[in-house]
Amino acid sequence: DYPLYYDAVNEKGLAMAGLNFVGNAVYQEVEEGRENVAQFEFIPWILSKCATVKEARESLNKMNLVGTPFSEQLPSAQLHWIIADENEAITVECMKDGMHIYDNPVGVLTNNPPFEQQMFQLNNYIGLSPKQPENRFSDKLNFNAYSRGMGALGLPGDLSSTSRFVRVAFTKMNSFSGVSEKASISQFFHILGSVDQQRGCCEVADGKFEITLYTSCCNTNKGIYYYTTYENHQISAVDMFGENLNEKELIKYPLIKGEQIYWQN
């Protein structure tokens, strides 16, 4: 079995995920004398070599990302990537004009458009705040902040990737977490819940809908991978450090999809 990763983390605490970049991703041609890495090998290539974002940057400058397909049935996926450790994050995009590596100060990424465009559009929301707004419309008019949360009026609520980028960036940058690991885990899933996709709201074909298949995070110090699925809101966990990290065979766990309900009587 050869795994094709959506997201992954290594034992050093470096994590990486790929997201859709259809129409913008252009991979390079194979070049003699360079370390050519196929798109489907990119995540394991980085995570098997690097322990930090700094090391990933150095490796990226030496490699050539190519579009060799995994198989005839699975052509190269058009993706861009976020790479992060506990201190920083970067976004990697391979486009017609070459590879781009960006600092990612918000630590989030969604699908299209290119990252520079996503970051620039945050300027449109400079006035958003978690605090209640003050009247800046006119000192000649008396306004009433009739509801809590009005400081975030204008925060986009649709399911487009640009709007989800703004929404999850605002939520992440303004959220507070408790000090315990459980509190942090809970808060993480609440943050990503702000961009959850519900079946029926985003139709991609006749009768077919885009949904949030799963949501995941990892304690990179302990090697514990936490996840929920669309059908199961209960957080499941896999202790990856509890496995033999030198194992040559692929260790697999099935996604827990059935809803787990805690009965109180």
Language model features by range: what are they?
Residues 17-19, 93, 226-228:
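Beta-strand residues in well-ordered beta-sheet regions across diverse protein folds
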